[in-house]
Swiss-Prot record:
Physiological role: Cell division inhibitor that blocks the formation of polar Z ring septums. Rapidly oscillates between the poles of the cell to destabilize FtsZ filaments that have formed before they mature into polar Z rings. Prevents FtsZ polymerization.
Protein origin, superkingdom: Bacteria
Keyword Repressor attached: no
Keywords tagged on the record: Cell cycle, Cell division, Septation
Keyword Cell cycle included in the entry's annotation: yes
Protein name as annotated: Probable septum site-determining protein MinC
One Gene Ontology biological process: regulation of cell septum assembly
Gene name for this UniProt entry: minC
Similarity remark: Belongs to the MinC family.
Quaternary organization: Interacts with MinD and FtsZ.
Source organism of this protein record: Listeria monocytogenes serovar 1/2a (strain ATCC BAA-679 / EGD-e)
Length: 225
């Protein structure tokens, strides 16, 4: 008979595997019994972090608390995280939004803030005082004189592409690059640039061709909204 609760050592440390075929009450009973039977095992000494793998199911906050309480009261193990093979509706919705490309043909004027969860394509200008926030990449077919914030939720792999003009500012995750008038002495009306975070954790401004090299997946992006 297959056990519904197992404790195993993995390359990531100690994991408790809870069968997704068993009810929560069965898991609670078997987990309590297993920990009671192993009072003298290596897991009952010094405190150890443990991951709880729950398979193809989701636990409610109450169920996670019940499992956590059993482990806390019957062992020296502390749960670092619960891991599931499935995602909640909210997580799926957020993933879908972040994977989309939003597009708009307009002028972002002073005081306006446009925020999208995925990649963003603007056909138009960003005036001084205007701002774009995107959790993904930002592409502007127009003049940029305002603020472009790509990867605003912490995505340092995001890039910005467009024609940066004074006094524009580029932000990627928590990095900031501000342009001054000296940056534009040799810029022509047709110059397009890319902005990205390099290996040193700094925003770099380079030619538009650089995107294909540093983010090859972007050259194949499709979509729209």
């Amino acid at each position: 008979m297959k056990k519904n609760v197992q404790i195993k050592g993995t390359k990531d440390g100690i994991s408790i595997f809870l069968s997704d075929k068993a009810s929560i009450s069965e898991l609670q009973q078997e987990l309590t019994q297993l920990l009671a039977d192993q009072k003298q095992n290596p897991y009952s000494g010094e405190k150890l972090e443990v991951q709880v793998q729950i398979g193809n199911r989701l636990f409610s906050e109450e169920e996670e608390l019940e499992i956590s309480t059993i482990i806390h009261e019957n062992s020296q193990m502390e749960i670092s995280a619960f891991y599931s093979n499935v995602m909640s509706k909210d997580e799926a919705k957020k993933w879908k939004e972040n994977d989309q490309i939003f597009s708009m043909a307009t002028i972002i004027r002073s005081g306006q803030v446009v925020q999208v969860p995925g990649d963003f394509l603007l056909i138009g200008d960003v005036n001084p005082g205007g701002q774009i926030r995107s959790n993904g990449n930002v592409f502007v077919l127009g003049n940029i004189k305002g603020i472009i914030h790509a990867g605003f939720e912490g995505n340092e792999n995001a890039v910005v592409a467009g024609k940066f003009l004074y006094p524009s500012q580029v932000r990627i995750a928590d990095k900031v690059y501000g342009f001054d008038s000296e940056d534009y002495k040799e810029v022509t009306e047709t110059d397009l640039f890319s902005a990205f975070v390099n290996d040193a954790g700094e925003i770099v401004i380079d030619g538009i061709h650089k995107i294909r090299k540093i983010r090859p997946e972007i050259s194949n992006f499709q979509g729209g909204r």
